[in-house]
């Protein structure tokens, strides 16, 4: 009888251990395959062996548009590199602007093809497919294959372990922001308000990832940009474009749910 009890206990214990291992796999996979810069980090480490005290990433979503072209003029005058998260459907008719972004050394990221929230957030598969579609179009035009992405509206409440693991399997890296001009929800904000918003850094003050937009109605963003650049330059920040070597930055998410990886 004691022998049977011991066998039952052994089998039960083995099942529990296997279950726990399967549950934590996605989390371990993410940790091993991702270098993540979170809002709570106190320092930012480059892909090299040295630490940079202050970094600023100027990022523009929703292009390419005519406004993108004007922004590029400002960036060229200021000798600053930025990153543009491209919406696939906006490329048609703006191929030369996309080429200019690439030729002038700016970062190019993916911002889905349709920017249709109901469609892209229907499933992880749909989301990944839209990123791939936009990446393929950009590759045809520039010869480069972007792998950095940004969620329309940000990853908060949309990213989980399952989705992140699938993105990493496709070599995509996620980048949110910790400075928000609020020019997406309100493109008509005054230039002075946009400049004020650009100075509010959430989390690690040594790294500013600034969210801006380059829709056709973001003319005030263009006007504010020189002052934003001057502000961070005066504070000693170094301007960089996001590349595949830049540590990921995405908002924290709960790992208790959606842990099954197919």
Residue ranges of model-derived segments:
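Generic "edge-of-domain/loop-turn" microfeature
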Residues: 26-29, 65, 91, 156, ...
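Catalytic domains of cell-wall/extracellular-matrix polysaccharide-remodeling enzymes
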Residues: 115-233, 237-238, 242-257
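Terminal accessory/targeting
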Residues: 1-57, 73-82, 205-262
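Active-site beta->alpha N-cap acidic-glycine motif
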Residues: 33-122, 126-140, 145, 231, ...
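A generic signature of intrinsically disordered, low-complexity regions enriched in glycine/proline
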Residues: 11, 65-66, 187
């Amino acid at each position: 009888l004691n022998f049977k009890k011991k066998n039952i206990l052994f089998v039960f214990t083995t099942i529990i251990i296997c279950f726990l291992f399967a549950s934590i796999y996605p989390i371990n996979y993410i940790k091993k395959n991702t270098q993540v810069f979170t809002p709570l980090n106190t320092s930012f480490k480059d892909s090299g062996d040295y630490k940079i005290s202050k970094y600023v990433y100027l990022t523009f979503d929703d292009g390419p548009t005519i406004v993108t072209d004007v922004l590029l003029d400002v960036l060229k005058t200021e000798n600053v590199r930025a990153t543009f998260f491209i919406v696939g459907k906006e490329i048609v008719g703006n191929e030369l602007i996309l080429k200019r972004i690439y030729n002038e050394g700016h970062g190019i990221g993916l911002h889905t093809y349709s920017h249709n929230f109901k469609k892209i957030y229907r499933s992880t598969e749909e989301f990944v497919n839209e990123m791939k579609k936009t990446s393929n179009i950009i590759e045809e035009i520039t010869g480069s294959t972007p792998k950095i992405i940004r969620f329309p509206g940000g990853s908060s409440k949309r990213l989980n372990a399952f989705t992140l693991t699938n993105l990493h399997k496709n070599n995509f890296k996620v980048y949110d922001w910790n400075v928000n001009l609020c020019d997406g929800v309100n493109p008509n904000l005054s230039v002075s308000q946009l400049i004020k918003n650009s100075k509010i850094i959430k989390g690690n003050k040594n790294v500013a990832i600034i969210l801006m937009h380059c829709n056709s109605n973001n003319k005030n963003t263009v006007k504010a940009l020189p002052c934003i650049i001057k502000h961070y330059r005066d504070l000693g920040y170094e301007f960089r474009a996001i590349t595949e070597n830049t540590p990921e930055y995405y908002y924290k998410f709960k790992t208790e749910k959606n842990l099954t990886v197919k």
